[in-house]
Protein backbone atom coordinates (compact mmCIF):
# COMPACT_ATOMS: atom_id res chain seq x y z
CA UNK A 1 0.00 0.00 0.00
CA UNK A 2 2.79 2.42 0.90
CA UNK A 3 4.47 1.71 -2.43
CA UNK A 4 1.27 2.56 -4.33
CA UNK A 5 0.86 5.83 -2.41
CA UNK A 6 4.51 6.67 -3.00
CA UNK A 7 4.16 5.98 -6.73
CA UNK A 8 1.03 8.14 -6.89
CA UNK A 9 2.78 11.01 -5.11
CA UNK A 10 5.75 10.73 -7.48
CA UNK A 11 3.40 10.68 -10.46
CA UNK A 12 1.54 13.74 -9.17
CA UNK A 13 4.81 15.60 -8.66
CA UNK A 14 5.97 14.61 -12.14
CA UNK A 15 2.74 15.88 -13.71
CA UNK A 16 2.98 19.16 -11.80
CA UNK A 17 6.62 19.53 -12.88
CA UNK A 18 5.71 18.89 -16.51
CA UNK A 19 2.87 21.40 -16.35
CA UNK A 20 5.04 24.07 -14.71
CA UNK A 21 7.87 23.51 -17.19
CA UNK A 22 5.56 23.56 -20.20
CA UNK A 23 3.77 26.66 -18.95
CA UNK A 24 7.10 28.44 -18.43
CA UNK A 25 8.27 27.47 -21.93
CA UNK A 26 4.99 28.71 -23.38
CA UNK A 27 5.31 32.00 -21.49
CA UNK A 28 8.80 32.38 -22.99
CA UNK A 29 7.35 31.75 -26.48
CA UNK A 30 9.38 28.57 -26.79
CA UNK A 31 6.40 26.88 -28.38
CA UNK A 32 8.14 23.88 -29.97
CA UNK A 33 9.68 22.90 -26.64
CA UNK A 34 6.42 23.49 -24.77
CA UNK A 35 4.64 21.19 -27.23
CA UNK A 36 7.07 18.37 -26.42
CA UNK A 37 6.52 18.85 -22.68
CA UNK A 38 2.72 19.00 -22.93
CA UNK A 39 2.68 15.92 -25.17
CA UNK A 40 4.60 14.09 -22.45
CA UNK A 41 2.10 15.38 -19.90
CA UNK A 42 -0.94 14.05 -21.76
CA UNK A 43 0.86 10.73 -22.17
CA UNK A 44 1.56 10.49 -18.43
CA UNK A 45 -1.73 12.04 -17.27
CA UNK A 46 -4.32 11.76 -20.05
CA UNK A 47 -7.17 12.55 -17.65
CA UNK A 48 -5.70 15.94 -16.67
CA UNK A 49 -7.45 18.60 -18.75
CA UNK A 50 -4.62 21.09 -18.26
CA UNK A 51 -2.24 19.18 -20.54
CA UNK A 52 -4.75 19.04 -23.37
CA UNK A 53 -5.68 22.70 -22.94
CA UNK A 54 -2.04 23.81 -22.87
CA UNK A 55 -1.09 21.68 -25.87
CA UNK A 56 -4.02 23.12 -27.78
CA UNK A 57 -2.95 26.63 -26.77
CA UNK A 58 0.52 25.93 -28.15
CA UNK A 59 -0.95 24.97 -31.50
CA UNK A 60 -3.22 28.01 -31.45
CA UNK A 61 -0.11 30.15 -30.86
CA UNK A 62 1.31 28.61 -34.03
CA UNK A 63 -1.96 29.40 -35.85
CA UNK A 64 -2.61 25.65 -36.17
CA UNK A 65 -6.26 25.96 -35.23
CA UNK A 66 -7.32 22.66 -36.80
CA UNK A 67 -4.81 20.77 -34.66
CA UNK A 68 -5.91 22.68 -31.55
CA UNK A 69 -9.54 21.88 -32.32
CA UNK A 70 -8.68 18.18 -32.67
CA UNK A 71 -6.83 18.22 -29.35
CA UNK A 72 -9.70 19.91 -27.51
CA UNK A 73 -12.08 17.32 -28.96
CA UNK A 74 -9.77 14.44 -28.07
CA UNK A 75 -9.58 15.72 -24.51
CA UNK A 76 -13.32 15.31 -24.10
CA UNK A 77 -13.02 11.69 -25.25
CA UNK A 78 -10.15 10.85 -22.90
CA UNK A 79 -10.49 13.01 -19.80
CA UNK A 80 -13.42 12.85 -17.39
CA UNK A 81 -14.40 16.49 -17.57
CA UNK A 82 -13.01 19.10 -19.94
CA UNK A 83 -15.07 22.28 -19.64
CA UNK A 84 -12.16 24.60 -20.38
CA UNK A 85 -11.32 22.59 -23.50
CA UNK A 86 -15.00 22.88 -24.46
CA UNK A 87 -14.74 26.66 -24.15
CA UNK A 88 -11.52 26.75 -26.20
CA UNK A 89 -13.18 24.55 -28.81
CA UNK A 90 -16.17 26.94 -28.86
CA UNK A 91 -13.87 29.88 -29.49
CA UNK A 92 -12.32 28.18 -32.56
CA UNK A 93 -15.68 26.95 -33.84
CA UNK A 94 -17.14 30.45 -33.54
CA UNK A 95 -14.19 31.92 -35.48
CA UNK A 96 -14.95 29.41 -38.25
CA UNK A 97 -18.59 30.45 -38.40
CA UNK A 98 -19.84 27.24 -36.77
CA UNK A 99 -22.10 29.07 -34.35
CA UNK A 100 -24.38 26.21 -33.31
CA UNK A 101 -21.45 23.89 -32.59
CA UNK A 102 -19.84 26.69 -30.57
CA UNK A 103 -23.02 27.20 -28.55
CA UNK A 104 -23.24 23.44 -27.91
CA UNK A 105 -19.66 23.40 -26.62
CA UNK A 106 -20.36 26.37 -24.34
CA UNK A 107 -23.44 24.64 -22.95
CA UNK A 108 -21.42 21.50 -22.20
CA UNK A 109 -19.05 23.64 -20.14
CA UNK A 110 -22.02 25.37 -18.48
CA UNK A 111 -23.38 22.02 -17.29
CA UNK A 112 -20.09 21.27 -15.55
CA UNK A 113 -19.96 24.76 -14.04
CA UNK A 114 -23.48 24.34 -12.63
CA UNK A 115 -22.85 20.82 -11.35
CA UNK A 116 -19.55 21.71 -9.66
CA UNK A 117 -20.60 25.21 -8.57
CA UNK A 118 -17.23 26.44 -9.88
CA UNK A 119 -17.54 30.24 -9.90
CA UNK A 120 -14.40 30.79 -11.99
CA UNK A 121 -15.62 28.36 -14.62
CA UNK A 122 -19.05 30.00 -14.57
CA UNK A 123 -17.39 33.36 -15.23
CA UNK A 124 -15.59 31.87 -18.24
CA UNK A 125 -18.84 30.37 -19.51
CA UNK A 126 -20.63 33.72 -19.11
CA UNK A 127 -17.87 35.50 -21.03
CA UNK A 128 -18.08 32.99 -23.89
CA UNK A 129 -21.87 33.27 -23.96
CA UNK A 130 -21.54 37.04 -24.40
CA UNK A 131 -19.19 36.50 -27.35
CA UNK A 132 -21.42 33.87 -29.00
List where the protein language model places each region.
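TPR/TPR-like (Sel1-like) alpha-helical repeat modules
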Residues: 77, 94-117, 130
Amino acid sequence: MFQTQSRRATSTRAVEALYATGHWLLSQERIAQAIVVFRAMIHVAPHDERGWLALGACHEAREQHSIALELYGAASEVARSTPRCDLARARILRSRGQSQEAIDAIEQAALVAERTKDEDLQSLVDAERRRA
